[in-house]
Amino acid sequence: MIRAIFGGTFDPIHNGHLQTAAALVKELGISTLALMPSAVPPHRPQPDASPEQRLDMVKLASQYHKAFTVEDWELRQDRPSFTANTLSEFKTQFPDDTLLFVMGMDSLMSLHRWHHWCQLIECAHLVVMPRAGVPFNPKNDELKEFISVHLTRDKNALNTQSQGLLYIAETPMVDVSATELRKQLQQREKNLPLPSNVYNYIRQHQLYL
């Protein structure tokens, strides 16, 4: 079984996340894609919304596509959410499944700064979605070597081995930035790239003001 996980801060989750994720579901022909908000990203500033609020927004956004599900494993842990630990735990829980960990190109380009980053590929395939303004051009030598060893252009290869591959998806580059979106919400702008139910939740709870 393919178990695909799209991890992110989702502060807030927006149409850019959802449109590219829906395109990935179609490209890979997977039946489900779990949206997993991270708990306390150790290498990034703390999210503006609480873990509970981010989870609520992800649950609302999951209605966007029938393949989307919600995974709250990291939010249920009483420790920082290192992706290497999460994938290792999932591999232990689901030893017969093939794990796909989905990330954006910006995450790949900074992957060498992640905790035990080389171990990610020992538990899962990494699937990377292109992002507007972020070229596929690694600067770090270790990361370059990592990519050269694990990169595949064949999406079907993800089904023939259980881990160890890095695949660059052909999903559209939707130019939405959560940072800019939070600024727009603070300025009370309208017609933002958010699902209507997520936008209403943000306004109801007076987030990002």
UniProtKB/Swiss-Prot annotation:
GO molecular function, one term: ATP binding
Source organism, top-level taxon: Bacteria
Metabolic or biological pathway: Cofactor biosynthesis; NAD(+) biosynthesis; deamido-NAD(+) from nicotinate D-ribonucleotide: step 1/1
Classification via Pfam families: CTP_transf_like (PF01467)
Cited SUPFAM superfamilies: Nucleotidylyl transferase
UniProt key word Magnesium: no
E.C. no: 2.7.7.18
InterPro entries: Cyt_trans-like, NadD/NMNAT, Rossmann-like_a/b/a_fold
Coiled coil: none
Any one Gene Ontology BP term: NAD biosynthetic process
Substrates-to-products reaction catalysed: nicotinate beta-D-ribonucleotide + ATP + H(+) = deamido-NAD(+) + diphosphate
Top-level EC class: transferase
Keyword terms of this UniProt record: ATP-binding, NAD, Nucleotide-binding, Nucleotidyltransferase, Pyridine nucleotide biosynthesis, Transferase
NCBIfam families reported in the protein's UniProt record: cyt_tran_rel, nicotinate (nicotinamide) nucleotide adenylyltransferase, PRK00071.1-1
Function, in words: Catalyzes the reversible adenylation of nicotinate mononucleotide (NaMN) to nicotinic acid adenine dinucleotide (NaAD).
Family the entry assigns: Belongs to the NadD family.
Protein name: Probable nicotinate-nucleotide adenylyltransferase
